[in-house]
């Protein structure tokens, strides 16, 4: 060993693996650059199996999502955290890169949307090249806007915080969406509500408690509708709602891809 070389690198690989498995995916990747001994431990299945959900908690993926099986547990983690994978039921799923928590996106087609099949209010379902799903919902004319999406069973580790986000776009002729709407989240008999705004008007000031959208890196916008906490390992039902029924003005130009349910760091 050369002078100044890290003594910890002389530890057996199984001890290094046990220590790294108690850190985070980011820390394990950083440790791999320390030395060959660290790299062997940091890239091992023993470490990355601890960052992945248990096999029984990983839902089956849709056909064709893993054409080339990943190399080892680290490869599987990087695949599932690098981009969403479609599930057989139409949802998409990915892993949070920091915590390994499962995240989901529910497509607009699976949401309960008022008058969704009435052409007067909603155009036919449209396809956008930058959407994860074959169809997105486009609002044409709505005198009363109401959406109540429901994501079925959500399971997580003790005290895992999640938030749900509406992912959408506004076309060049959007209108009537600059007034605060009522968003809600319900889980385990607890209902939480907040005010949100889909299209802030720069000429109008909003109350401090009104949640505003932000632009995403993929060209869409997202609006946080609420958050909740998973306690324990039992599954539970969580539902989300968005409604604006006080101002009966027309609304249009909203294109909705779906609802994301993400771990909140």
Where do the protein language model's features map onto the residues?
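Short, basic-rich loop-to-helix N-cap that marks the start of a DNA-contacting helix
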Residues: 29
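Plant-skewed but cross-kingdom recognition/interaction modules and surfaces
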Residues: 3, 10, 14, 18, ...
């Amino acid at each position: 060993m050369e002078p100044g070389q890290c003594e910890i690198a002389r530890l057996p690989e199984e001890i290094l693996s046990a220590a790294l498995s108690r850190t985070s995916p980011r820390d394990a990747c950083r440790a791999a650059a320390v030395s060959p001994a660290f790299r062997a431990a940091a890239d091992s299945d023993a470490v990355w199996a601890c960052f992945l959900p248990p096999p029984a908690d990983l839902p089956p993926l849709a056909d064709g999502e893993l054409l080339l099986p990943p190399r080892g547990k680290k490869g599987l983690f990087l695949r599932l955290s690098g981009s969403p994978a479609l599930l057989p039921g139409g949802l998409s799923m990915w892993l949070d890169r920091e915590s390994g928590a499962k995240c989901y996106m529910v497509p607009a087609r699976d949401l309960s949307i008022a008058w969704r099949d009435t052409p007067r209010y909603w155009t036919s379902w449209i396809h956008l090249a930058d959407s994860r799903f074959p169809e997105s919902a486009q609002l044409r004319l709505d005198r009363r806007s109401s959406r109540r999406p429901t994501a079925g069973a959500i399971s997580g580790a003790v005290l895992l915080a999640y938030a749900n986000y509406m992912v959408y776009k506004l076309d060049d002729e959007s209108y009537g969406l600059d007034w605060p709407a009522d968003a809600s989240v319900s889980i385990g008999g607890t209902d939480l509500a907040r005010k949100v705004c889909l299209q802030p008007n720069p000429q109008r000031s909003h109350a401090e408690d009104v949640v505003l959208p932000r632009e995403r890196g993929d060209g869409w916008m997202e609006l946080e509708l609420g958050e909740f906490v998973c306690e324990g390992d039992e599954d539970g039902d969580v539902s989300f709602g968005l409604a604006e029924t006080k101002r009966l003005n027309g609304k249009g130009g909203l294109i909705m891809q779906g609802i994301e349910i993400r771990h909140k760091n």
